[in-house]
Amino acid sequence: EDCLNILGRKGILVHDMHLNRWKTAPLFQRVCSVSYNSFRFWIRLGQWYDGHGFVKEALQCLKLSGKEKEIYSCMIRNYQKVPFSGISFDEVMKWKESIPEVCYLRGMYCYFHQNFEGLNREIIRLNKMDSDEKKKKEIILNLTYVKPDMSLEKWLNLLESYAQKAGTFSLYSMLGNSVTYLCGLRDLSELFACTRKEENRKAHLWRECLGENEYTGYCLARLDYYLEIQQKDAVRDEDWDVIREGTDQDFWQLRLARMYLLCKFQTMKPDEEIAEYIRYLRETLVYEENEWCVRNVDAVDNLFFDRTNKRERFSVWLLHSEDDLRQDLNEDNYLLFFCLAKGFILINQYEKAERIHRKLIPYLQCYRRSYLLAEILFQQAIIYWEGRESSQMLRSMIESFMISGEYRYVRMYIDYGNRGRGVLEAYIEWLRSSRPEGWHRKKKYNYGNVLRMPLEDYMETVLRLAKRETKYVLPLQDHSVEEKLTIMETVILQDLAVGASNAEICKELNLKLPTVKSHIYSLYKKLNVKNRIQAVLKGKELGILK
């Protein structure tokens, strides 16, 4: 143990607090890798990993052995975990067997590749099986849970009918690679956008028919929804308890979902104790071996929490993430694309945000993730408005509120400062002129929450809250010799470092020339320099530029 601690202090090993084990630091992993040719070695190593619960590592070793029988056996034993293990499982599409486990793996493979006809075939195949065992029903529930064209109400009815005979069931994953249970593998807004009586009925059904982990996910989804519709006072104590009672031994997806919700609450009501807990959760997550855990932690940390405290880091995160935009969109990275789109909107880089939207909008429509889609459509409206394309802006706003009109989202519309407020004002003014009958009646303001309001009152409420929100200002956090740069100044400094002219900066950031010159003058003053070369050298000295 002393040797391990010494190697940890030297940076050769890293301690994984969640799994309570040591692993090689990323810097040394390539150096430590050795090539082995014996398939027996890889089988034995894979079996060891499998026996200790490390499914991804087990399959990596067994694939290196080249023995399909061993790969098949491992996947069947761990069929619930394989689709979410972060490793390819395309072998399943070649298998001819029709046992429930194989049907599940094939169905999830089809789901991830948007082959919904293939997903339906596996569900039909399962329903035709003579076996009435609980495993088959549980697999059907998991496959229909991710089926985009199956309503949540219909799925709940299926769950209830199965549970009457077979007891409680498990969902193998609710989150996928999302950070919010409200919009993971399935959008759950429908559970809460209803009367309190109906919500309680669904909550009771969820609790009675599913396990403890699933109810924890339900509570976090409900908390997220009530924060989104600005009803934090209506949040139930048991939902807060799910966050307060968490430990660093919980699986990483749950810890990340907690971190996201705390960051969201922090933007509404800053609290140093919550900020400290967010930092603690981050420390437990950054050493996870799952790449997308670390990437999503970084995105949440920069976009929802640290952008107010570490502006340079926020802009550097955006800059360094641009390479990801060349990748194909999939279940692993769609949330990162969503976060990057929002980040680019916040610093006026509309062209980059729009490139993301071209991929992300059809993807979210395909999987019917209403919660994320409504916000992306609002972002698209902001881009059109800034480009003076009024008709396109109106179309995007209509599409966004067609979703929000049902679920009554609020916060997503008030987080964009003056940009968002201008779009809301223009859209509501257009509605007043085109549909006067709904806007000129006498309003009442004691509905209790947005779910009870007529559509016109709901939209007026969103606009009123957007006006109340001040333009996003990034406060100084310390009093170093050099004043902190704003996000825009940091981005411009990065452009100066690659030799961009003022005209090129104007085009990239969608700014006018006097505005760019003003930012450059301001960053010169803050860095105490007189020209571009000195500014770049100072930026490197301070660590702003890499």
Locate the predicted segments by residue:
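Structural motif corresponding to the intra-repeat A-B loop/turn of tetratricopeptide repeats
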Residues: H52, S65, H113, I229, ...
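Linker/hinge segments immediately adjacent to helix-turn-helix/homeobox DNA-binding domains
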Residues: F337-L373, L377, E386, L394-I487, ...
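Residue-level signature for tetratricopeptide repeat
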Residues: W48, C61, C74, Y109, ...
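Extended alpha-helical scaffolding segments used for macromolecular assembly and cargo binding
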Residues: N37-H113, G118, E122
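Helix-turn-helix DNA-binding segment
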Residues: K471-Y521, K525-L527, Q534-K546
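Alpha-solenoid helical repeat architecture
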Residues: K56-L59, E68, Y72, S131-L143, ...
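Short capping/hinge segments at domain boundaries that bridge a core fold to an adjacent linker or tail
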Residues: L4-Q47
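Internal alpha-solenoid helical repeat scaffolds
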Residues: E97-M259, C263, E273
